[in-house]
């Protein structure tokens, strides 16, 4: 498969569909109440029928808003929208009514596709206020409405007969045509609509294919659980098509471990917060081990790290490490279905200690780097050579360089077409063809591996002018079993302070948290040391607006909420 030969993403899909057994299950939703399966042939049929229906309401370049949890119909709808020459605008299900209002009024969709009545409630008022919305399609639970708007049922659409002559078999979309507008969740301000092209995503798939193919020896299985409205998982669905995978959709985060056991994925993608939680849980269980079991675990981590870091091992050490593959690592993998070849981490920086630990215990973890604006992947570690403190070499077609101030710049087909309705912001970040990422990094001259050192706008500059990386210190805090979440504060101040969300067992235990902070301070420079801290009972969450949908802390929102407490630290 030569991805350079495809003009658009629908051409890619139909090319792959023609080469699959039409009766093989392609998509499966692990929903206990509404379990669904679609074979390759059923998926193709549904795409044709939905695209045909959409053509009654959209013209080339029109936007279609898609609001749904992860489920098979998500991929079907995305493909149908593109086949009708429209542009998919995916939106998070966790958005508020005001968020949806902003998105709808910004991108002006002709059609809104929503999963069910519950999700529709947050959109209904804005839908009724805007005449540019011609049609609303529900996946299920369509209730009758007294409205001029046209409401349609997905299930009825895909059951209708469609004559061969009425099938839209090809779209006019070119590689330079917009495929989707993905609104960045952002850690501050209104979200910006990132316009990604068909060619940008196809370009990204070339690099992804090189990462994934060495991990595959038979038809791969993926478990999709990150929101498909995020650029990371959105592009992963096309990677799944490229390799002819079977795709399972997780029911919900609370059922994730059960879903992993059932799906037995070959590859899993996740964000750093997932690995942080996993690290904490495994560590807690390992600390409970005694006797021989404890010794085996310690040896597994020790020799696993040596192997990962390419440190020399004698024959005896190599033999022990091989035995530990059977005695320990195989059992660890079995907890994730037994077929897992690799985790792929993206959507934020993975802590070095966590990365080393997971790789050492038998869970290969490949850290990558990207932005929504780069479709989204810039680079990723290959399984053949993992350098855990880096994000790997740049993907094919990605040109990467470091500016004088350390900022990472990216050029290539994968770079966005621009921000929707926002030429001013577009010109700020794309200059002379280079995307200014806002991330600080360095490139290893020996092998071209990229290393991220910080987020430019997150760097804290002390009153004395010292640059402090909050991510480094926050990772040290969050790696403690007693601390669930945290955020540093201290820009233009004489010292740093911290907001700490302890784990359930340590809520209000100020003395224990103080001991942990003092221990961490021992290994920090004078300007990095945390002088004061505040314990908060409330977790940072997506629901309270303090986390992005990919579980990154919204620094400005947290700061605004706790500003009086934070500023009071400097008055005492």
Regions found by a protein language model. Name each.
Residues 26-58, 62-75, 79, 96-101, ...:
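Conserved AMP-binding/adenylate-forming core of the ANL superfamily
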Residues 37-41, 179-205:
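Conserved AMP-binding A3 loop
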Residues 112-114, 402, 412, 417-418, ...:
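AMP-binding/adenylate-forming catalytic core of the ANL superfamily
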Residues 202-221, 228-329, 339:
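Conserved AMP-binding/adenylation subdomain of ANL enzymes
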Residues 83-156, 504:
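Structural core segment of the AMP-binding/adenylate-forming
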Residues 120-175, 282-329:
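ANL superfamily adenylate-forming
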Residues 268, 324-450, 456-459, 473-474, ...:
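Conserved AMP-binding/adenylate-forming
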Residues 23-25, 161-183, 190, 215-221:
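Conserved pre-ATP/AMP-binding loop-to-beta segment of ANL
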